[in-house]
């Protein structure tokens, strides 16, 4: 179990990656307590002085001008949680819920939300007990925050809704019992503070970021393997080429290929005097394409790290000034655009991989047996595996359409521009799965091509990459049931097996 001490506003991408992959034991820096208490006191003072402040003693959305009597304030907070828990579809994975809750704890504990520490402590206890609220994946437009997902999270604090514990669906009341908690009566503003925020969108987008990083590492390894299998040149990775263009991520991408391919190899030496002048773009332009993808990954990482540590509640309590101010930090446009950029990178990584794989099975280009199998005609080899890769690449092109350019007014036109960040982040999971499938096919093809180059060997790192695959998948000597081979290669990549072959500091969270 991963241990994390939350210092509000200081979560790193490396910490968030661990949280997304492992059950987590949480603690909260005690220095956060004073700010939370002071913030909650400011809210209490509003009630005491009978002021009218949005979110504390008013309705919500279009009903913001409706004043709520003091006797109804507890009911108001409970009602907003229950009424807003209106999501639909399959439940989020436990890992996504865990990440979302931790992001919410990080935001609330900064002391700008007027929420009591006991509410945050309850969220911590849910995570520590591995009790995860059942949260439908669909139902948020990413402004005013992720209302429905966060409402489903919050229902469990009231002893309502459902949760998942050890893969079983249980009631909210049972969930509290397991976590050693009792139902919470929410104080003024606490329901709204729990619901307002970008944490669902950000959790989805962060998972997409971490997947994109893993895919980038895998694709670089597969691409280097394909260079060797196709008897490609190392010259396109020469640092001088990339230095004069000036893009740092392109230079770093080229460095990664040099790191993998080394200065030469037996395979490389075997074709130094060949007649080929230039390689096809899918081999030669890898630093340019992958460098551009790396830049999008890095840009998105910067945005998402800021958002993960942000306060996206509304209204905000500025205790030092005694002010409670309404704004729009719940609008997840930065998250949506970051996710859209990740979608472009994930799609392009897969698209380039599919082209390399297509090159390998083309004997005219690769000088390998047609479809990478002996006795062609009797054997079809990798023929239909490439069709599968093409289908996945094409599907990703549709999914890569930017979500952030879409908007549909809600709440009787009070919330008249929204980000669609939740979908922008959520679809990254499907895209990553598609690209991983494409890479799995290329990995099999590249390893097959390298084996056909025997007894000549590639560089040490490429040989390590091939041997890791060969521990699971044998050489394809004749036609056999192909799907299990793809599944095994896919599993290898899903485990991020090749991340350790990358240069350090290349990817933001690694």
From Swiss-Prot:
Post-translational modifications: Contains an active site 4-methylidene-imidazol-5-one (MIO), which is formed autocatalytically by cyclization and dehydration of residues Ala-Ser-Gly.
Major site of localization recorded for this protein: cytoplasm
**Pathway the protein contributes to:** Amino-acid degradation; L-histidine degradation into L-glutamate; N-formimidoyl-L-glutamate from L-histidine: step 1/3
Query: What does the record list as GO biological process?
Result: L-histidine catabolic process to glutamate and formamide; L-histidine catabolic process to glutamate and formate
Question: Crosslink site(s) for 5-imidazolinone (Ala-Gly)?
Answer: 143-145
E.C. code:
4.3.1.3
The compartments listed are: Cytoplasm
Which residues does this entry mark as bearing 2,3-didehydroalanine (Ser)?
144
A GO cellular component term found in this entry reads: cytoplasm
The molecular function GO annotations come to: histidine ammonia-lyase activity
Q: Which family does it belong to?
A: Belongs to the PAL/histidase family.
HAMAP family in UniProt: His_ammonia_lyase (MF_00229)
Per its record, how is this protein called by name?
Histidine ammonia-lyase
What gene name does this entry carry? hutH
């Amino acid at each position: 179990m991963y241990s994390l001490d939350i210092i509000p506003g200081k979560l790193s991408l490396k910490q968030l990656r661990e949280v997304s992959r492992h059950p987590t034991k949480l603690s909260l820096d005690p220095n956060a307590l004073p700010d939370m208490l002071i913030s909650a006191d400011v809210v209490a003072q509003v009630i005491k002085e009978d002021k009218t402040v949005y979110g504390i003693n008013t309705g919500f959305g279009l009903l913001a001008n409706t004043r709520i009597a003091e006797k109804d304030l507890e009911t108001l907070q409970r009602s907003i949680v229950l009424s807003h828990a209106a999501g639909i579809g399959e439940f989020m994975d436990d890992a996504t819920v865990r990440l979302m809750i931790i992001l919410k704890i990080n935001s609330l504990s900064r002391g700008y939300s007027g929420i009591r520490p006991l509410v945050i402590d309850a969220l911590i206890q849910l995570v520590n007990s591995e009790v995860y609220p059942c949260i439908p994946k669909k139902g948020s437009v990413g402004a005013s925050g992720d209302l429905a997902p966060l409402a489903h999270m919050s229902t469990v604090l009231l002893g309502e809704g459902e949760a998942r514990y050890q893969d079983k669906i249980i009631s909210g009341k049972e969930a509290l019992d397991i976590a050693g908690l009792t139902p919470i009566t929410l104080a003024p503003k606490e329901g709204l503070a729990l619901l307002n925020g970008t944490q669902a969108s950000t959790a989805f987008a962060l998972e997409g970021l971490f997947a994109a990083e893993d895919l980038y590492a895998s694709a670089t390894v597969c691409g280097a393997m394909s260079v060797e299998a196709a008897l490609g040149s190392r010259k396109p990775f020469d640092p001088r080429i990339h230095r004069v263009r000036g893009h740092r991520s392109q230079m770093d991408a080229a460095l990664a290929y040099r790191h993998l391919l080394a200065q030469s190899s037996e395979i490389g030496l075997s074709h130094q005097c060949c007649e080929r002048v230039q390689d096809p773009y899918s081999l030669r332009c890898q630093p340019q394409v992958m460098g551009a993808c790396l830049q999008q990954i890095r840009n998105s990482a910067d945005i998402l790290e800021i958002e993960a540590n942000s306060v996206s509640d509304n209204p905000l309590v500025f205790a030092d000034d005694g002010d409670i101010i309404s704004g729009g930090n719940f609008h997840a446009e930065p998250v949506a655009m970051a996710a859209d950029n990740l979608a472009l990178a994930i799609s392009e990584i897969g698209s380039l991989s599919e082209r390399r794989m297509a090159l390998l099975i083309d004997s005219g280009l690769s000088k390998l047996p047609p479809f990478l199998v002996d006795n062609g005609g009797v054997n079809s080899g990798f023929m239909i595996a490439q069709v599968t890769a093409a289908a996945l690449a094409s599907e990703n092109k549709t999914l890569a359409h930017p979500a952030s350019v879409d908007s549909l007014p809600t709440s009787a036109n009070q919330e008249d521009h929204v980000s669609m960040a939740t979908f922008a982040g959520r679809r990254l999971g499907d895209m990553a799965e598609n690209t991983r499938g494409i890479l799995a096919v290329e990995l099999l093809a590249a390893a097959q091509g390298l084996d056909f180059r025997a007894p000549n060997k590639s560089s040490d790192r490429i040989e390590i990459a091939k041997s890791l695959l060969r521990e699971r998948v044998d050489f394809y000597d004749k036609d056999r049931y192909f799907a299990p081979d793809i599944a095994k290669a896919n599993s290898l990549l899903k485990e991020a097996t090749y991340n350790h072959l990358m240069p350090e500091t290349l990817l933001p969270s690694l």
